[in-house]
Amino acid sequence: MRVRPRINRWTEARRNLVFSSSISKSLVQPHFVVSGKDIDEPISGMPGIQRQSIDVLLKTIAEDIKHGLSAHMLFTVVEPEHKDSVASAASDMDMHGIIAVREIKKHFGEQIVLFTDVCLCTATDHGHCGIIVDHQIDNDVTVQRLVEIAIAHA
């Protein structure tokens, strides 16, 4: 399956991200989403950045938009019990990361540009960014898995 989406210029947020001469319009705000409710936990190594549940994340993004930040990068924090060798959680439609994508799109639509992390390392039990076959990372299998994850996130 060939899926090669492009960053198009259909929305103002996308045009600003790609063509703006203003630095603030080109910034991408990182967000780390966790399961649960009312979670707003600071990340010690990243001052000003928190691990947040979806309910808190939606409020944070609304505030970011008020301050002119329209580009957002979503990283899903996967609990150890949901990790496996092929990063199943990364494309599980019932996992908080994908639910967050749906909620963000529903609440903010074309006001924002939303990026998601499709790297396998956060959802694999071995921590590598690829699918391991016979003790080696298999690039072809990994690319196919990344495509599946990207489609789930879209």
Map each language-model feature to its residues.
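Non-catalytic positions within long, well-ordered alpha-helices that form the structural scaffold/packing
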Residues: A62-K66, A154
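N-terminal small/glycine-rich loop or linker at the start of catalytic domains
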Residues: S21-I49, F115-I137
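Structural preference for beta-strand elements that scaffold enzyme active sites
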Residues: S26-P30, A71-M73, Q111-F115, A152
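Alpha-helix-loop-beta-strand connector modules within alpha/beta enzyme cores
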Residues: D84-V118
